Design a protein with these regions (language model features):
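Terminal connector regions
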Residues: 466-537
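Glycoside hydrolase catalytic-domain context in secreted enzymes
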Residues: 1-473, 481-491, 495, 537-942
C-alpha cells in the first residue's frame, strides 16, 4: 500500500523524511552487518548477567552466591594489604592509639590511586576511601580539611594510553588555603595526634613516567625533576604541616620506588613512612588496621629505593632511541626505534649490592649510603625478630641443600617475618675470560613465618635445588652451568644484609680488612670441585638461541656491557649513535619465511568422523582421535578461531565448541578493550609482591577464578611477569618486582590458584617488554645471559612450577624480530627447550605492519589477539587454501587451543550428550533485526 500525498507541503515533508530514512538505511544496515560479524565481542560486552545457575558445570564457584563471593573478596583484599604494606620509617610514629584524631593532608587523600590505568584499569565505583577506612577502625578524621579538599577545583591530570601529555600531568597539590583559613587551622588543634600526608604517583599502560619537564603552567614546568622525586608543592606542604603537628606520617601511594631521601633528615624529615602501593577497591581497610596497630606490618620491598636515578644503570638506556640514519616511522610503527640493555644482568639490587661488595673488597669508588635509601627486601615491623641459621643439609648427589632457620620474636607485638635466602656464586677467572657476569647476591628462596607472639620461635626449613642457582655462559659452554668454586647461602632480612653477612664470612679470618657489619654465622658456604653443565632441555638441547638479539652480532662487538670486572669503566652511557645497517634493515622488513618450523607437527588424516570436542575430555593430547576432530573443522572456522582471538575464542558449531570469553587484568577481571563486566579490583601486583606470601597468591588466583565463573569468563590476561627494569617504567604496577625469581614464584602461585577453577591464565609479556614508550615494534637488544637469567627467568619458572596453559607475547621486537614471530624464542625455547604445550597469544593486534602472520604461525604462535579486525583471519584463510604446510601449522595451533580450552571452564554446561551449541539469540540482535526490518518497511512505503 502506497501513501497518497495530497498537498505540496506533505509531499515535501515526506520527501525530506524519505531522505532521512534512506540515510539511516545506508548507515544502519552496514552497521548491523558489522555488528553480526563481531557478535562475540558484543555478546561479551553486553552480557552483564551473572551465571547463577551452575548445574552440570565442570567448574563451579565455591560460593553459593555472588554476594558471598564479594564479601570474601573484601576480606581477602584487606588480608593482602595487611601482609604487603611496607613500613619504611617509624620514629615513634606508629601504631596510633585507639582514640587517635588525625588530619589527612594533600589533595590525594580524597583522590587516591587504587589501580593502574590501561589493561589494569577496573571499575572502582564502590571503592573505600581513606577517611572511611580509618573511621571504621576507630580513628577520628578531621572532616573540615577533608571537605575542603573534596570541594577543591584542583584535579590530578592523568596520562592517556599511547598518547601521554606530560605537560598536563600534575601533582595537583592545593596548599593555597589550608594554612590561611582560620576554621581549618583551628581544626588542626583538635585533630592533632598525627598528620597523615598522602603522596601519589600514577602509572599505567601506554606511557612511561617523565624523568623531567612535566606539569606545565604558564609556559613553565613545575615538574623540573623526575616524576618520582618529591615536588616543590609537596615539600612546602610537609614543611608547613610540621609546624602544626609533632607527628607526621607519609603514605606512599605509588607502584614505583621513589626518591624519598629528603623525608629522612632536616626540615622535611617525617616520623613515619608507609608504602601502600595501589591498594585496590577494598584494601585500605587493611592499611588502616596497620596504622591503628591491630595488624603488624610484614611487607618487604620488591624493588630498591635509590636517591639519584642517574646512578641506575638501566636508566642510561631507557625510553627508546632512533637509529642515527633513520627518522621516526610513527607511534604505532616503531621499526626505527631501538634500545640496548647495556646494564646486562645488573638490574636493581644486583648492581648496588655488587658495587657495594666491590667497594669493600676491591677498592671500587662507590658509596652505598650515597646511592641507596632502602634495599630490596627491606621492611620494618612493630616488633623485632632474630634469625639464626641453626643447621644445613648439603646433598652433593641430589644437588640440594636444606637450611634450618630459627626465627624468634624478641619484641612486644605479635607479627610475621620473612626469611630471605640469597646466593652468591664465586666470580672466577673463568668468568672474566668468558664474559660471564655474577651478581654478589641473588634471591634464591623466601618463606613467610606464621604469626609469632612475643618470645615465640618458629623453625623455618628452606629447600634449595642448586640448579636454580645456575648461570648462563654464552661464550664457552653455551649453556647453563655451575662452575668450580665457592658458593654462599646467606640468611637475611634484605639484600644488603645478605651481602654484609657474606663479606663478614669472607673477612672474618683476615687482618687486612676491618669489616664489622653482618653476621657470618648466618651464611652457609660450600665448594664445588667440578663444573656442572646443564644442557638437557625438554625436547631440545639447551644452547645459545639469542645471538642475534645481542647488538654486537651486527656491530662487531662495538658495545661493552656492564661488567663487575670494572664497573667504573663499563658503566652504561646512552647509546644514541647506533646506525641501522643494510643487513639489519633487511631483517626489519619481516619478509615471510618458509613454513618449516623446528617443532614437530603430526600429519593430519582426513576422516568423516562426527566426533565432538567434549568426547575428548580426559583423552591424551596425542590421542589419534584429535586428528579426527580437527578435520571436522572447516577452513573458515580455523581461520576465525586463530585469526580473531581477541578477548575470547570463536565458537565452532561442527565440533560443539562454544568459544570463550577472555578478559584483561591483572588486578582482577577487568573486561576488555570495548568494555564488559568488571570484577573486584584487587591490590596491584607490585604491592602484592611485598607480601612474600605464596599461599596468599594462590588464594588470590582462586578468588579471581571464582568470580570468572560467575562472569562466564575463561581466559585471563594475567599475571604480569615482566621485570621492573626501571622505576620510571609506566607499567610497574602490573609487574611484581625487579627480581625474576620473586616474579616467577609469585606468578606460579597465582596461576595454580586460578587453574583450580578452569581459568586459563596468560602471563605476559614475552619478553623484554619492560617499558611502554615506542612499544609498538621497537627493537630491544640484550645479550644471551641477560635474557635468560633476568627477563626469560620468570617464564621459565612458571612453566616448570605451575599448570600454566597460556602465554602472551609482546608488541616489541626481540632483537629485530617481533616477539610473536621469533622462532628461536617460541619454537626453540618455549616449545622445545621448556616443553610448553599451552596457547601462545599475541598482545593486541590491529593490522600493524610488523605483525607477520606467516612467520608467527611458523614460529609457534597460536592465537592473534584481534577482535574487530579481519586482517589476520582473512590472511590465514587465504594461506590455508594455498599452502598445505601452513595448514598443518594452523591445525597444530587449533589443537593446542581446543585441548586447553576443553580442559577449562569454557565447557561449563556441556556434556558428552551435547549435540549442538546452546545458542540463544541476544537481546541486541533482536533489537537490530527489528530496527532493520522497520527501515526496510518504511523505505518500501515511501
Amino acid at each position: 500500500m502506497k501513501i497518497n500525498f495530497k498537498s505540496k507541503g506533505m509531499k515535501y515533508l515526506f520527501s525530506s523524511m524519505s531522505l532521512v530514512w534512506i540515510t539511516l538505511f545506508v548507515v544502519l544496515i552496514p552497521t548491523s552487518i558489522n555488528a553480526f560479524k563481531n557478535e562475540r565481542i558484543l555478546d561479551n560486552v553486553l552480557d552483564n548477567e551473572l551465571q547463577e545457575n551452575q548445574d552440570n558445570f565442570l567448574y563451579k564457584s565455591d560460593y553459593s552466591s555472588y554476594e558471598n563471593l564479594k564479601k570474601y573478596h573484601k576480606e581477602l583484599s584487606e588480608e593482602i594489604t595487611q601482609e604487603s604494606a611496607v613500613l619504611l620509617k617509624n620514629d615513634s610514629c606508629l601504631p596510633l592509639k585507639n582514640t587517635a584524631k588525625v588530619t589527612l593532608f594533600s589533595r590525594n587523600s580524597v583522590d587516591l590511586i587504587y589501580s593502574g590505568t590501561g589493561s589494569n584499569s577496573i571499575n572502582i565505583a564502590k571503592k573505600i576511601t581513606l577517611k572511611d577506612s580509618l573511621e571504621s577502625n576507630g580513628i577520628s578524621v578531621n572532616p573540615y580539611l577533608n571537605d575542603y579538599y573534596k570541594s577543591s577545583n584542583k584535579e590530578r591530570i592523568e596520562l592517556n594510553i599511547d598518547n601521554p601529555n606530560y605537560d598536563a600531568l600534575t601533582i595537583a597539590e592545593d596548599n593555597e588555603g589550608i594554612f590561611t583559613k582560620g576554621y581549618l587551622t583551628n581544626s588542626y588543634l583538635k585533630y592533632n595526634d598525627c598528620a597523615i600526608i598522602v603522596i601519589s604517583r600514577i602509572g599505567g599502560e601506554g606511557y612511561d613516567l617523565p624523568t623531567s619537564n612535566f606539569d606545565k603552567v604558564d609556559g613553565k614546568y613545575k615538574g623540573e625533576n623526575g616524576y618520582l622525586t618529591l615536588q616543590k608543592d609537596e615539600l612546602d606542604l610537609i614543611k608547613k604541616v610540621k609546624r602544626y603537628f609533632s607527628k607526621t606520617l607519609v603514605l606512599l601511594n605509588t607502584s614505583s620506588a621513589m626518591d624519598v631521601s629528603l623525608l629522612l633528615k632536616d626540615e622535611y624529615e617525617v616520623n613515619g613512612i608507609l608504602w601502600i602501593g595501589y591498594p585496590g577497591e577494598y584494601g585500605l581497610n587493611g592499611i588502616s588496621k596497620i596504622i591503628k596497630g591491630d595488624i603488624n606490618p610484614s611487607g618487604k620491598l620488591p624493588h630498591t629505593y635509590i636517591k639519584d636515578i642517574s646512578s641506575y644503570p638501566a636508566h642510561q638506556n631507557f625510553g627508546g632511541f632512533i637509529f642515527k640514519n633513520k627518522t621516526n616511522a610513527g607511534e604505532y610503527d616503531c621499526r626505527y626505534n631501538y634500545l640496548i640493555y647495556q646494564e646486562g644482568i645488573y638490574v636493581g639490587y644486583r648492581y648496588y649490592e655488587t658495587a657495594y661488595e666491590s667497594s669493600i673488597l676491591n677498592s671500587l669508588n662507590f658509596s652505598y649510603e650515597d646511592n641507596v635509601i632502602y634495599p630490596f627486601g627491606y621492611g620494618l615491623s612493630y616488633t623485632s625478630f632474630i634469625k639464626d641459621l641453626i643447621g644445613a643439609d648439603f646433598n652433593k648427589d641430589k644437588n640440594t641443600c636444606s637450611l634450618y632457620i630459627k626465627v624468634k620474636n624478641v619484641g612486644n607485638y605479635e607479627g610475621k617475618d620473612v626469611v630471605q635466602i640469597y646466593n652468591q656464586n664465586e666470580y672466577t677467572s673463568f668468568d672474566k675470560e668468558n664474559l660471564v657476569e655474577k651478581a654478589s647476591v641473588n634471591l634464591i628462596s623466601f618463606k613467610k613465618t606464621k604469626l609469632l607472639k612475643p618470645d615465640e620461635s618458629d623453625i623455618v626449613v628452606v629447600d634449595i635445588n642448586l640448579e636454580d642457582m645456575k648461570n648462563y655462559d654464552a661464550n664457552y659452554f653455551k649453556t647453563y652451568f655451575l662452575g668450580k668454586g665457592n658458593y654462599y647461602l646467606s640468611v637475611a632480612s634484605n639484600a644488603h644484609e645478605a651481602i654484609q653477612n657474606i663479606i663478614s664470612l669472607k673477612t672474618k679470618d683476615t687482618s687486612s680488612t676491618s669489616f664489622t657489619e653482618g653476621n657470618y654465622k648466618n651464611v652457609y658456604s660450600f665448594n664445588l670441585d667440578k663444573t656442572q653443565i646443564f644442557k638437557e632441555g625438554n625436547k631440545r638441547e639447551i644452547t645459545n638461541e639469542f645471538d642475534e638479539v645481542n647488538i654486537n652480532h651486527y656491530l662487531n662487538d662495538k658495545i661493552t656491557y656492564l661488567s663487575r670486572n670494572d664497573f667504573s669503566l663499563t658503566f652504561p652511557k646512552p647509546l644514541k649513535d647506533i646506525e641501522l645497517t643494510s643487513v639489519m634493515e633487511n631483517e626489519l622488513l619481516d619478509k615471510s619465511e618458509d613454513n618449516s618450523s623446528s617443532f614437530v607437527v603430526d600429519n593430519q588424516v582426513k576422516t568423516n568422523s562426527n566426533i565432538k570436542l567434549f568426547d575428548l575430555l580426559n583423552k591424551d593430547y596425542n590421542d589419534p582421535k584429535w586428528n579426527n576432530l580437527l578435520n571436522n573443522i572447516s577452513n573458515e572456522d580455523l581461520a576465525d578461531l586463530i585469526g580473531k582471538g581477541g578477548f575470547g575464542s570463536s565458537k565452532i558449531n561442527s565440533i560443539v565448541y562454544p568459544g570463550s570469553k577472555d578478559s584483561d587484568g591483572p588486578s582482577g577481571i577487568s573486561g576488555n578493550a570495548y568494555g564488559g563486566k568488571s570484577g573486584t579490583c584487587f591490590p596491584s601486583q607490585s604491592l602484592i609482591a611485598a607480601s612474600r606470601n605464596e599461599d596468599l597468591l594462590n588464594k588470590l588466583g582462586l578468588a579471581i577464578a571464582n568470580e570468572a565463573i560467575y562472569f562466564k569468563t575463561t581466559g585471563w590476561y594475567a599475571p604480569g611477569i615482566n621485570i621492573q627494569r626501571n622505576p620510571y617504567s609506566g607499567r610497574n604496577n602490573e609487574y611484581y618486582s625487579e627480581d625474576p625469581y620473586l616474579s616467577g614464584i609469585l606468578g606460579s602461585n597465582l596461576i595454580q590458584g586460578a587453574y583450580k577453577k578452569g581459568i586459563i591464565t596468560y602471563p605476559k609479556h614475552l619478553v623484554l617488554n619492560d617499558q611502554e614508550m615506542h612499544r609498538h615494534g621497537i627493537s630491544i637488544f640484550a645479550n644471551e645471559q641477560t635474557i635468560r637469567e633476568i627477563y626469560l627467568k620468570p617464564f621459565e619458572i612458571i612453566i616448570k612450577k605451575s599448570p600454566v596453559q597460556g602465554i602472551m607475547t609482546s608488541f616489541n621486537r626481540v632483537g629485530l624480530k617481533w616477539s610473536a614471530s621469533n622462532k628461536n624464542l617460541l619454537a626453540n625455547v618455549l616449545r622445545e627447550e621448556l616443553g610448553f604445550e599451552g596457547v601462545i597469544i599475541t598482545d593486541y593486534t590491529s593490522g600493524y605492519k610488523w605483525m607477520n602472520v606467516n612467520n608467527s604461525i611458523n614460529a609457534g604462535l597460536n592465537l592473534f589477539l584481534a577482535s574487530s579486525s579481519d586482517t589476520y583471519k582473512n590472511e590465514i584463510l587465504s594461506k590455508i587454501k594455498s599452502d598445505d604446510n601452513f595448514k598443518k601449522l594452523v591445525l597444530d595451533s587449533a589443537h593446542k587451543i581446543l585441548y586447553n580450552y576443553l580442559h577449562s571452564s569454557a565447557m561449563n554446561g556441556y556434556t558428552k550428550e551435547s549435540k549442538k551449541l546452546n545458542n540463544s539469540i541476544s537481546t541486541w540482535k533482536i533489537s537490530i533485526i527489528i530496527l532493520d526490518a522497520l527501515q526496510v518497511l518504511l523505505l518500501y512505503h515511501f
